[in-house]
Amino acid sequence: MDINNEILKLDWKREPYGLYEPIEYTLAAGGKRVRPQLAMIASRMFDGKDEEVLPAALALEVFHNFTLLHDDVMDKADMRRGRPTVHVKWNENTAILSGDQMLIEAYKLLSGVPADKLPRVLQLFNQMATEICEGQQYDVDFESQEQVTIEEYLKMIRLKTS
């Protein structure tokens, strides 16, 4: 199963277009798709079925890209994956709203996880989300600090990448 094709199959042709076009633009930009690939590989290691892990794998990628939209706004980044960032191509409000919608869409995708696995998946997903937010806050905090230790920096990176 090609995770990139599965991501591109997600339907973003909805109204209001100003909310969903930036999501489609973001996900169509590609990327390594490391998180969903790792989810698929881990599942296969334990004889899991691709169709059972696919909703969680897709949710991971949508969530990851949501964090990138918000990170680009916070960092005032102009480019991402060789293309203008959403807040540059559209505007900051659109980037924030589209990012927020991606978060919601990630949870909607998780609803496709088999019922017996869903509580644990949600627990892990929420832990990941919390760690990413904590790491991002450290990143913001470090911008105003004179010095950051290597240990602090590594902690920030570990949390941001969860």
PLM features: what roles do these ranges have?
Residues 65, 109, 131:
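Short alpha-helical functional segments enriched in proximate histidine and acidic residues
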Residues 40-44, 107-112:
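Short glycine/serine- and small hydrophobic-enriched flexible loop segments
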Residues 13, 28-32, 97, 113-162:
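All-alpha helical catalytic cores of prenyl diphosphate-utilizing isoprenoid enzymes
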Residues 38, 106, 135:
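Residue-level signal for inorganic ion chemistry
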Residues 24, 91-92, 154:
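Short alpha-helical transmembrane interface motifs in multi-pass membrane proteins
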Residues 1-63, 69, 73-88, 127, ...:
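Conserved N-terminal diphosphate/IPP-binding helix and adjacent helical/loop segment
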Residues 88-108:
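Multi-pass membrane catalytic core of lipid/isoprenoid biosynthesis enzymes
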